[in-house]
Amino acid sequence: MKLGINTLLFLFMVTVESFGANPTWSTSIANIIYSNCSSCHRYGGIAPFSLMNYDEVVAKKNSVLEAVTTRSMPPYPADTKFRSYSHQRNLSDSDINAFVEWVNNGAPAGDLASAPNPPTFSSGPIIKNPNFTAEMPFYASQAKAGGEDEYRCFVLDGSPTKDEFISAIEVIPGNPEIVHHVLVFQDTSSIPLQLDAQTSEPGYPGFGGVGSNTAELIGVYAPGGEPYFFPKGFGLRFRKGARIIVQVHYPAGTEGQMDFTSVRFNYSDAVSPREVFIDPLLNHQNIVNKPFRIPAGQEKTFTQRMTIPIDATAFAVMPHMHLIGKSTKIILRMPNNDTIPIINIPHWDFHWQMAYTFKTLQKVPKGSILESTVIYDNTSENPHNPSSPPKEVRVGEGTTDEMMLTYFYYCQYQSGDELITTEVQDDSPIDMPLTDITFMQIQDGVIVKFPGQIAVHSLRIYDVLGGIVHDQQSNHRHQHSSLTIPISISGTYFMHAIDADGKQYTGRFSIMR
């Protein structure tokens, strides 16, 4: 394979910059912090201190060092070596090693004049002209310092007059400093209103759910999260007459602080939107080793299996357990007995629940089997156990009860679904049409051809499972009209690149050996 001199120089600089010794704030640490920490660690964010500039990070460098080396921060419970996901917030081994080396070397600043600018965060909603909006009433958190977190459900005003299809959903925390996470449901029954009427304050308590068997999960918010955009042409049914219920998590120590969280929806403009469903396909009915009981003082492992009755397409996965959940691992067993990783959460944290979106849509063939292995720890050694001493635990929505559910976002499969990427959302500034980028296979890889000279800031290649097979970053402004990427394994791949001006480029290609 012949490489142009510019390409060789570019790859050399990327290698030196990414893996060279003596990282500084300006060359690498700032990008790591801004990309993974600052969305929460900023003034007005939910984190307890800001990490928005060199001085702030140096002042907290030891705390940050402990958090990143123990992988307690950023909070992203899924094992991304098992499978990677869109918009994931976790540090690579090289990121962690760079931060450790930076601290050990005295946290050098480098050339601050060349350091990247801090990120800017919108103070308002991203969905500017929603088709539907609803707000909860003003509410003062009752979560006392040193006490328990509060989980409260609110029934929001407003309902659609006919069935609509939601193409985008945004949760806007009224007080980002106290809203830990939000689950969004719709319900056509009157049960949530009845529960709401039983309390004098706005809303009603709800730890494990919203108290209605007919409520349907439609959205999730966690700190630093962005609106959820379904790929074009897809939508989630918003039922005529349905009310929106939000379950809001307020951490202990927020007592007396006010919140007024709201939600915004955009509706699909497709003539016939493809309907997306969110259902707990793995649930208490398909537990293999029933009954679902966890004896006091024991760890217990359960397995679920579900045979898929149709060809389906999966967008995202969201496991759900309560406080004695320890771990969950899910695979897809194909009809030919091959296995595909879906999700692995080795250390379950009830307080950090989220939906994990596949980087490319996952085909789930008819006859394949979803299979989970879930462990519960009902011992006194579990610091999250709500009962002391431990008591037998069964299914239920209460604090001392448990659940074993995994929600999937899915639809009926159509040919080509597995080529649809979710890495770039509909509101992202995709400046170059897909046809403007071409790919040419060569003996040892592929040549990516851009329509003109661009300064590549970052370029990643993903496989069909969302795994990163090539990653290069650069702070230099060297211009390229093409880049050569070494890839030796046959398959379909997806490219996402960003130039020095923030323009984004996407494309897909196949390698045949």
Task: Give residue ranges: language-model regions.
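Bacterial Sec-dependent N-terminal signal peptides
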Residues: M1-T24, L483
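Aromatic- and Gly/Pro-enriched helix-to-coil junctions and flexible linker segments
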Residues: G20-F154, V246-Q247
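Solvent-exposed strand-loop boundary residues in beta-sheet-rich modules
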Residues: Y43, T188, M334-N336, L465, ...
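A mature extracytoplasmic/lumenal domain signature
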Residues: D55, Y250, V374-Y376, G452, ...
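Beta-strand-centric surfaces of beta-sandwich/beta-rich domains
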Residues: M73-Y85, S114-T313, M318-L419
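Low-complexity, Pro/Thr/Ser/Gly/Ala-rich linker/spacer regions in secreted
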Residues: S415-D431
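C-terminal outer-membrane/trafficking sorting elements
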Residues: D431-R513
